[in-house]
């Protein structure tokens, strides 16, 4: 590109202390991305796949932010669109993004019609020993009493920068569940934002990550409660080691009129090593009295009693750390319905973390 694109990403809904420089991130992008279409496999007849420019794409706000839309505009392709056409829960789709070296942008739109369920699994892979970047934006709309389940694993090479974005809207009694494993990419900008518009709608996010080898993770997750008796849960579980860094922003926003709403945000971090950067901003915004919001974070090294227990069974400290770290990843990975995808995660993690030899 002749002029680099200056992007503001992962911006908090409300600024905190500016001197911390954690309210948002600024990225200079000087590439011209190529449109990348996923390979799509659909099981069952309750879903259709098309490619098109999506009307109303801009009306759904995403976690990484509107500046990321510009990469899709530069690439100029048509979004993959998945829509339900029946009321079956057995139908699911697997989308694979297998990148060579280079710079790419992709968009995916999910639409679950009234009383239907849409199940989608996404695999981001490739880029091993190659430099590049990938921008993947997913936006979802769940009509009344519809449910969307998204399972995403990011297994990119360490020389890749990944922009992994999500935005969703739920109508009355609708629900969105987002499960993500962020294991690759040297630099990751990930986020999600969901608007719970309808009464008794819900959102759940279960995010796992393992950052090492100088990886940098920058994340922003927001849920906005509009409707009465809406519920949300965001669970973030991760491991930091080998000079890695992580910035996580988690916001629960109770808007006027959402009486009876409940929101929970939890973060659990295992820190293996001393040269690490761990930053967290848990934020609760409230314009309504009759609501319940909770957030909590636990972080630190393995407890001495755990290490003692494992060492008494002949497991050295380094192996014990690998066992406990793997258990956190497995807890998220086990939520993914496709065995073949779970095996891809196991292969990516490698045999060095296998615990069979020590038990």
What is each PLM-predicted segment?
Residues 303-306, 322-330:
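Small/polar glycine-rich anion-binding or flexible loop at a beta-alpha turn
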Residues 24-26, 36, 42-43, 243, ...:
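Residue-level detector of solvent-exposed, low-hydrophobicity positions
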């Amino acid at each position: 590109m002749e002029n680099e694109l200056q992007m503001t990403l992962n911006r908090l809904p409300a600024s905190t202390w500016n001197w911390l420089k954690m309210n948002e991130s600024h990225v200079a992008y000087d590439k011209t991305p190529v449109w990348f279409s996923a390979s799509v496999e659909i099981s069952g007849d309750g879903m259709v796949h098309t490619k098109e420019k999506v009307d109303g794409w801009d009306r759904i706000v995403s976690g990484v932010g509107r500046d990321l839309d510009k990469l899709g505009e530069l690439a100029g392709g048509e979004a993959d669109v998945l829509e339900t056409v029946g009321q079956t829960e057995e139908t699911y789709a697997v989308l694979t993004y297998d990148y060579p070296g280079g710079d790419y942008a992709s968009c995916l739109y999910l639409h679950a019609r009234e009383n239907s369920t849409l199940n989608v699994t996404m695999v981001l892979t490739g880029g091993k020993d190659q430099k590049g970047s990938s921008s993947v934006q997913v936006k979802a709309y769940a009509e009344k009493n519809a449910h969307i389940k998204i399972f995403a694993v990011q297994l990119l090479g360490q020389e890749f920068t990944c922009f992994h974005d999500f935005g969703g809207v739920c109508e009355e009694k609708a629900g969105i569940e987002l499960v993500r494993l962020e294991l690759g990419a040297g630099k990751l900008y990930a986020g999600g934002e969901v608007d719970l518009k309808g009464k008794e709608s819900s959102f759940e996010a279960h995010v796992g990550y393992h950052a090492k080898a100088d990886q940098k993770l920058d994340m922003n997750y927001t849920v906005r409660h509009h409707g009465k008796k809406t519920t949300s849960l965001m669970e973030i579980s991760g491991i930091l080691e080998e000079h890695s860094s992580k910035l996580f922003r988690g916001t629960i926003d109770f808007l006027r009129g959402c009486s009876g709403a409940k929101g929970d945000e939890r973060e659990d971090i295992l820190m293996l090593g001393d040269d690490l950067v761990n930053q967290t901003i848990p934020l609760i915004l409230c314009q309504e009295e009759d609501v319940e919001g909770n957030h909590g974070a636990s972080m630190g090294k393995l407890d001495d009693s755990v290490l003692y227990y494992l060492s008494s069974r002949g497991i050295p400290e380094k192996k014990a750390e690998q066992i406990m770290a793997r258990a956190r990843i497995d807890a998220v990975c086990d939520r993914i319905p496709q065995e073949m995808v779970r095996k891809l995660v196991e292969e990516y993690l490698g045999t060095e973390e296998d615990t069979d030899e020590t038990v």
